[in-house]
Amino acid sequence: MLEAAGAVLLGSAALLMVGRLGNRGFFLWLRTVGILGLLVGILSLALAALTGSAIAGLVVGVITAAMMYLFSSRIVRIQMGAVDAEEFLRYKPEYADKLRRVQEMVSKLASKAGLPEPELVVVPEETGVGGYPNAFATGRRSKPTVGVTEGLLRHLDDDEIYGVLGHELAHVKNRDTLVMTVAAAVSTAIAYAFDPWLNAMYTEDWEDIAFLVLAGMLASLISTLLVAAISRSREYLADEEGAKLSGNPMALAEALEKIEAIVKSNPAPARSLSEVSTAHLWIENPFRGGLLRLFSTHPPVEKRVERLRRLARELQGP
């Protein structure tokens, strides 16, 4: 099994290197497959080296993936404090016209993308992060949910919102919820495979347990960084496909610049690990500073804008 794990790691590293040769759809897909392969390779090594917790790690990973994928919409809504559009309008009716237009945009983009009608939810400013302009998509491809913040309704114009919604529906079309759920579940399985308390059930050697603590910390760090790298690749892909879907790359670029300027001037405080864990779902990470930079789930806005400007020139033609 060690040889097989080594082969998976080498093959995945090769795919990752090839994927880094470009920043367009096919190369981004190769990059994602390569990073997922590295995660699976690390897990395979853990399962090969550790007999006791291997089964536990695998079972926990599978259960976590299934539960997170099946109930992702409900889980994310609770984490973000999102409410139905109708409920939001009951106590903030001044947004009725804007939300009606947003719902029409969502319906139009979903139809163009060949997706079923998504559920629209709103994150009120009272949640803290809801005061910043932002958006997210979650749920299965057959039953998607698109969320916008109150800050997005207040700060962005219709063209910019349309560009943002195109990005979010591209995530749904690309099954990014499934990709990120699998990546996070494998990362969880790695952590459990190296868990010192589980392994203590199978050994009384404290030197082995100490090694597992260090190995587990390193494996968890590497897997977390790899999950963040997958998220960054998927953001590039959603930018490209979302801009093509909306037909206006510059509107998305301007929206990203506006969101970045507002977040930079007054970053959202990360009040809990639960909030930080949702960072990869937003179109732009609202949290800033500290160690969060090391685990960035989004590419730099300036790079995203540069790519969108290039795409706009290509779509305009000679």
Swiss-Prot record:
Zn(2+) binds at residues 167, 171, 235. Binds 1 zinc ion per subunit. This is Protease HtpX homolog. GO terms for biological process: proteolysis. Keywords: Cell membrane, Hydrolase, Membrane, Metal-binding, Metalloprotease, Protease, Transmembrane, Transmembrane helix, Zinc. It comes from the Archaea. Belongs to the peptidase M48B family. GO terms for cellular component: plasma membrane. It is a multi-pass membrane protein. Its EC number is 3.4.24.-. GO terms for molecular function: metalloendopeptidase activity; zinc ion binding. It is found in: Cell membrane. Its cofactor is Zn(2+). The chain crosses the membrane at residues 1-21, 35-55, 56-76, 178-198, 209-229. InterPro entries: HtpX_protease, Pept_M48_protease_HtpX, Peptidase_M48. Signal peptide: none annotated. It holds the Pfam family Peptidase_M48. The active site is at residue 168. It is an enzyme of class 3 (hydrolase).
